[in-house]
Amino acid sequence: MSNEDVAEDVSQVTDFHFHTCRKFRLFSSKSDGYSQNEINIRNRVATSSQLGVTFVTVNSNQLSCFHTKSLLGYKITRENMNVEVTDLPIKTIRLHGVVLINDMGVNSDGTVLGVLHTKNNDVSVDVFDIKKICTSSSIEPFKPLCTTRVGTEQINQGSCLEWNPAFPDTFAASSTDRSILVAKINVQSPANQKLVGIGKFGAVTTAISWSPKGKQLTIGDSLGKIVQLKPELEVVRSQHGPENKPNYGRITGLCWLATTEWLVSLENGTDQDAYLMRCKKDKPTEWIQFHELSYSSSKWPLPPQLFPATQLLVDWNVVIVGNSKTSEISTVGKRDDWQTWVPVEGESIYLPTTSSGKDTVPIGVAVDRSMTDEVLLNPDGSQRHRPSPLVLCLTNDGILTAHHIISTFAAHIPCQMSSQNLAINDLKKLQFDSQKPISAPPSDQTPVTKPSTVFGQKPEAETLKSSLVGSPSSVQTPKPSSSLFNPKSIASNIETSQLTESKPSTPAAPSSQPKIASTPKSEAIPKISDKTLEHKKAELIATKKQVLIERMDKINDSMAGAKDATMKLSFAVGKVKTTIMECADVVRASLGDSKEVMDELKNLILSIERMSDRTQHTVKEMDFEIDEKMELVAGVEDGNQVLEKLRNMSETEKLMRFNKLETAADLLNGKYEECSDLIKKLRMSLSEKESLRKQAILSPLRLSSNLNQLRSGSETELALKVMRNVSKIIMDTREQIQRTELEFVRFQRDVKFQNFKKGKENLNFTQPLEMSSLDGDAPQGKSLTDAESIKVRQALVNQIQKRGIVKTRNVIVESYKKSENSAAMKNDLLDTSNLSNAILKLSMTPRRVMPSSSLFSASPSTPSTKSDAATQADEPPIVKTVVVTVESPAKPIASAPAVSSPLIKLNTTTATTTMTTPKVTVPKEEANKTQDQKPIISTPASSSIFSSGSLFGTKTQTPLVSKEESTLTTGVPSLINSSLSISPQEIEKASSKVETLNKTEEVKDEKSENEVTPDLKSEEPKSLETKVKEEPKPAVQTPVKEEETGSNIQKTPSFSFNSTTTPKSTSSTSSIFGGGLKTQTPSSSNSTNIFGARTTTTATPTPASNTSSIFGGGSKAASSPFGSFGQAGCQPAKTSNPATSTASVTFSFNTGATSASAKPAGFGSFGAGASAKPSSVFGGSVTAPTVPNVDDGMEDDSMANGGGSGGFMSGLGNARTSNTSGGNNPFAPKTSTGTSASSSSWLFGGGGNQQQQQQQKPSFSFNTAGSSAQQASAPATGTSSVFGGAPKFGSQPAFGAKPFGGGANAGLSKNASIFGGATSSTTNNPATGGFAQFASGQKTSSLFGGGATPQTNTSIFGGGANTTPAPTSSVFGGGASANANKPTSFTSWR
């Protein structure tokens, strides 16, 4: 065969061939064919290389064994190479209980023999010890070590058996009832068997093959499917036969070659086709046909079967394959790929023919590796080869052939093993010479043939019977047609042989008598005696008896055959039944599929109908449009001309016109962009001019900021909107203040006429009354003219400027958002609708420039004694509700705030509750001789605009002052915050009461240390007149005595629109809206603010300061009807460290926050003391987190690290304590990250807490001076915001974390927002400029949130913090990042 003729699956090899040895006859020729029982035997040859023993199935229930090496004892020559060896010594084995052998095999270590057999439809696997079989006597049947039953059906037969190639104690077996099992045996303890897996599949298993490593197994079934299984019979995957050949039947052979490759043969009619199946993961299965193995040339009625011998698979990648349809043994090997190897011509394995010249086919193949002698390649021994494996092939003619494998391939290393010299007892040589005299003496059987003709016997039966009589060896080899189920036939044959052998002369005598009597017929009759007749009768009876016995044997055989036929018929019926059931299932499945197809077709038809309807509708619409356009075209007279021109126009001209149009469009687009740029520039110029115009009424110090330029018109517009809103609020507030001042004068006059004064010791207000500090100054008449009103106002202004004390009035404001259930709410007492107008008018009123005041002053200053009188407007009074609240500085004090209910019920959209009136304790005024030498001590009292508690009914309790406090702070009255002026002598009594209460308080739990139940007592208020020093005198700073702690008292710098600053003085600074603060310096001076309020502040040991807001009172607020709306945070555990006290008044929509320790506060132009903790414009305070100096890009708007919560109008003031400094939510409370606290709050949220070593932060609040010393105490909870807190409508608010939020958390954008973000990770690189400064956490000062140190790089709404200004900074943003590439502006909103 040339190379061109070789297919891809065939490889011609020269280094691999076979050397043939002698051939041996093991049983007689099956010239009359095979019985069905013998056909069902799957493999008839098995060898044990470890023991050097080979087993051959010579009959359906009989085995023969012999030494494998004995095959090489017969030398081959040219003369005897075609001569059969008939005297091979073998041992005949009868197995106990075995009737029909189906399959057999030797395990991997060659110690046991497994036989799959069937007996009375019971299929079982018997495991025999090979050594016992060889060494025991053959007289008694051999008993197995253990027996394992396979299948449970009534009609069952063994199918196949396969030992695990890696684990010698494991085998798999199957039967025709679709059962399969995997068992594990124990040779030392045969009773201990283990069924690894047992199951029943959908088809009969016809082939089993283990993987080379023995980890898994593959089975092939009668439906042509290959299934990969685990030993527990768990299905790994399944594969059907080739898709292009759907008519294949059962699997006739299977061999697992490699991990993803199998040798598979499938039944194709009466033939079979062999394939290489390659199954790789995530790839289609490949099928490569082996044409050499698919070739069929046999005419024998044997079923198609493949016999793969895998003894060399692991070592050589070689499989010796026998095919029951061809007489050639093939080799499948792998070098580059799996192929069929074809050796040189004449060196392959060709099975011998029969005596009649008919080809034979293999019925068993095995490979033995126990040969240790060199192979003689020629008779003289001149050519030798190393010891090599021996291939054993058993033909259907009973011939066993042996062939040496001669391989010179370098990869084929020697794989021989030394076998044990196991002795086999009862070896006997075969004798097949008796076959020749069987046909020699037919004359001896002549008398026997006569009665046989009488009973219709055939000559063939006589020939068989003669062989039985003449040769005793025929008894040892039963007839092939003998019944399996009737052993009596064997016994009858034995009896017949014994009967004939006992009288050997009896057949000879009657045979001679007829010959003698046949010649002289006449003489022979009278000479016959009676004795002779009797002898003849006895002989005839014996002959008849023998014929009867033979007839009985035939009847037994026919009955056995009928029984077998019946069993086959039952099995066939079962198969037919199974097939019918399968067909029924297929029909059902087809019906189901048909229904599904019909449903799909119906759906498609419906879809097509819908589409047709839509198409018709579309066509109608198109027709309508076409009609309209045709009408339009018909109205054009020159339409045809235009169409003709368009048709006549060439493609080039069309393209040119299109290019011109495109160019014109591009030019137009460019012009549009230019116009857009010019419009932007124009807007920027307009915004700059607007900014310059507004700066005319602002403080000159604002002009010094280099951060007052905006980048774009959008930023300018947004910032102007914010400014207008803030200004509107300020104007409304100023207007209300003006009205309430005039109301105050008239109300004071009424108080005098009604003689409304009472004692000053214990004040308890049940009506909204106010103690006047301007007693006797108001006009006496009830009706005033315009001139008198102007005089009264001037006198009031002079008094206020001199004394610096202004009472807080209540302002009517409407809620910015009306309640949904306003009709159902009760106690509509308040309205905040005019607040925005008041603040706007207040901000737009020109203010007088203070000569020496510093907007960002951090040093002590001496304010001027003059203030702007523009706020005292001559307008009729509106509010008749006056609230006096006494607010705790930081630690609780003995006196509780007096809360009054309004006299009139105002129209409001927010329901409120009636407030109870806590006790206000005012000590009597006593003479103090040392008053001139000591600073004025006042009780700190700050009130919200409406009440000391929450706007919506939250009761407040003033905290107690610890016993370590040495001094108290006098009240800080203002137009917003009214307080009672108390002399130092009165404070001493208050202090004694406080100490008594504190002693009782210490016994309680720490959680309730800061709570006290006020003693409610109603008394009419008496007016108190505050003693004001006309001239400032030098005063020595009184140090605070400390017994337990040694914390230093920090001085609180002041900041206000006030008069000239005098260094080294005790300055009383007032903010625009009232109270100021006083710091201890070597000298003293007095100052009043624009509205005439003067305050004094002394260092008092306070753990934290309290803050009240418009919509929330001080600390320890009880729950209100509106939940946490306006609820203040709880006071933490008090500490003993002293701090500077501050009466803080916040103009905010958030409750006041209390903390465990305080920081020095900065100062804003609208509030003296600002929080060291920064706060957002609309939310809580912000702690600058440590984030990288880069922008992380777009982040999720949800709360990061749980630092803050909620969004705009979500939660409504729900305070939340967090371990992290949330900076995302501008409306949420900020948690304390250190041990200090502040009392500032933002416009819409309270101030938070700050770490002890952090720098001061800007604040945007309307509060008085509020500052306290640093204290190492437990961290305080953050404040809650009216418009912050927990999310009400989701965790990602519409106005949530980023747009108005504070400093971002770690990982978020560093320059996140104009109103938040712009945080700095280090104190040396703080954020600057814009609203971003409100949450930057730096020492900045701005118009709405001051700092302790004046900075140069500041803007109107946020100051710098000792940083170099960013090149791109604006009035409301920018310049917040040290990285110039990451500026902060309005465009940073996300």
Swiss-Prot record:
Residues 1073-1373 are annotated as: 17 X 2 AA repeats of F-G. This is Nuclear pore complex protein 14. May serve as a docking site in the receptor-mediated import of substrates across the nuclear pore complex. Plays a role in apoptosis by tethering caspase ced-3 to the nuclear membrane preventing its autoprocessing in absence of ced-4. Residues 851-864, 1051-1071, 1095-1109, 1231-1243, 1264-1280 have a biased composition (Low complexity). One of its GO terms (cellular component) is nuclear membrane. Interacts with caspase ced-3 (via propeptide); the interaction tethers ced-3 to the nuclear membrane and prevents its autoprocessing in absence of ced-4. It comes from Caenorhabditis elegans. It is a peripheral membrane protein. Residues 434-455, 464-521, 1078-1090, 1342-1371, 1378-1390 have a biased composition (Polar residues). Sequence repeats lie at residues 1073-1074, 1091-1092, 1111-1112, 1122-1123, 1125-1126, 1163-1164, 1166-1167, 1178-1179, 1244-1245, 1283-1284, 1289-1290, 1295-1296, 1300-1301, 1315-1316, 1344-1345, 1357-1358, 1372-1373. The gene is npp-14. It is found in: Nucleus, Nuclear pore complex; Nucleus membrane. SUPFAM superfamilies: Nucleoporin domain (SSF117289). Residues 434-530, 851-874, 985-1118, 1183-1280, 1342-1390 are annotated as: Disordered. Residues 1201-1210 have a biased composition (Gly residues).
